[in-house]
Amino acid sequence: MEAEPVSDAAPLAVFGAGGKTGTEILRHAVHKGIEVRAFEHTLPEPSDRVDNVEYLQCDVLNDDFSSELEGCRAVISALGIGFSPSTAIDPPPLYTEGTRRLVEAMSATGISRIVVISAAFVEPQPSVPAWFELTARPALHNILEQMRAMEDLLERAKGLKWTAARPGWLLDEPYTGEAVITDERLAEGCFRCRHADLAAAMLEFVCENT
């Protein structure tokens, strides 16, 4: 049975909503008057939550969350893997299996639009500093390979309208509204990106369908 069309006023589903980028997505959405459903593995403390947001506890690797997606117009995935020696060696399959389960739930509920966080470094970037290429990239290899596999998964999915946001090195600093958005390659001097600027861009990608 074909799903009923969903209006632009319908809520957005944000996964990984309790993380740094996820929280900034919620703040930007509320500021713009956009309704959101915030999905998070471990719910933030009440004092850390964004006002006027519906929070739902969800383990994307194990839970059935299709019913909670009903009526949403799009999905924003701010799922991410915290870096540590153990996750660098053997990262949990959050980008691959987690995204696959998001896509399955979207298919079951008639949602076709998703924006995810990947990384600029899944592709060679001529403008990045030498120290990053020599130290950080090797340490992040397994996580970056999983991000690349996630993008391949999205590319193969039928009927899916997807965008992978590929930020540079993320910083926990205030919003500037000056993010430089390009295709494939980082712009010169744009090695670093703020969580809040990434969040605003991801929200724009959904709202403008870009």
Question: What is the meaning of each model-derived region?
Answer:
Residues 10-32:
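N-terminal Rossmann NAD(P)H-binding glycine-rich loop of SDR-like oxidoreductase domains
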Residues 11, 18, 35-37, 85-86, ...:
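Conserved Rossmann-fold NAD(P)-dependent oxidoreductase catalytic core, especially the SDR/UDP-sugar
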Residues 12, 38, 44-101, 105-108, ...:
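NAD(P)H-binding glycine-rich loop region in Rossmannoid oxidoreductase-like domains
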Residues 40, 118, 166-169:
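Conserved SDR Rossmann-fold cofactor-binding beta-strand/turn motif
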Residues 73-74, 112-116, 163:
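Conserved catalytic-site loops of classical short-chain dehydrogenases/reductases
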Residues 146, 165, 189-203:
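Substrate-positioning beta->alpha
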Residues 151-173:
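Conserved beta-loop-beta element that borders a ligand/cofactor-binding pocket
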Residues 174-179, 205-210:
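Glycine/proline-rich active-site loop of Rossmann-fold NAD(P)-dependent oxidoreductases
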